[in-house]
């Protein structure tokens, strides 16, 4: 219907609405920026928390509605990726499972998780990511990207972890039964660092669920969203993501806190 065919009252009502300033203009701009800064992974709940932190007075439903108007929706990139299997049987020390899937640590640096995952690169090589995360805060404490999941990568992981652990802590560190975690070098080093090793049951990834969850997020939220040509680019992508994850990515399970905020509040 042409505007000239509308009833006079309807015509002027529409004209007035069109010329009226958008009261949500600032909030819309904030939503778009927050969505972009989150690698387009934040849904309306997280964006609502961020908006409230920034001083906007709005409801979750308002954010949901505005995201719809702006055409913003989360896309999960869950393409199949090959899993890295480091289990080669009993080749050294197999530690007891001290956690039994009780992932309820509240204090940072009491329980840590570690593992290695692999990523296929455009140049047909593989990149291997070794990480250590904190169970309580979900902070990524250490992450090492290498072209091989060998003892060298393991040593670099432990060297970096040693620099970042506070003095006088004696955390449990849980891993799978991968060959590298059974070695005499690993066992001796973690004990010297005051770490108590714990291991999953053979072939049970659920025993190390927090670590599996992080690697899943890393791949869905970042790595799987773009072709990564080589190891150098993978290192850059992982470094940027981990910095954002620790300092900026809020968790709905942690009352809207980032891992660093959680650790800071726990230490206060």
Which residues does each predicted region cover?
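Two-metal-ion RNase H-like nuclease active-site motif
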Residues: 110-119
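Mobile genetic element proteins and their domesticated derivatives, centered on retroelements
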Residues: 1-4, 11, 31, 47, ...
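Active-site beta-loop-alpha junctions of metal-dependent nucleic acid enzymes
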Residues: 121, 125, 143-167
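Basic, flexible linker segments flanking DNA-binding modules
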Residues: 9-107, 204, 260-266
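K/E-rich alpha-helical interaction surfaces of small helical-bundle regulatory domains
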Residues: 1-18, 37-39, 237-255
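Short glycine-rich loop/turn motifs
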Residues: 125-131
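C-terminal domain-tail junction helix/linker
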Residues: 191-195, 217-268
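RNase H-like two-metal-ion nuclease catalytic core shared by retroviral integrases
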Residues: 86, 90, 175-177, 183-184, ...
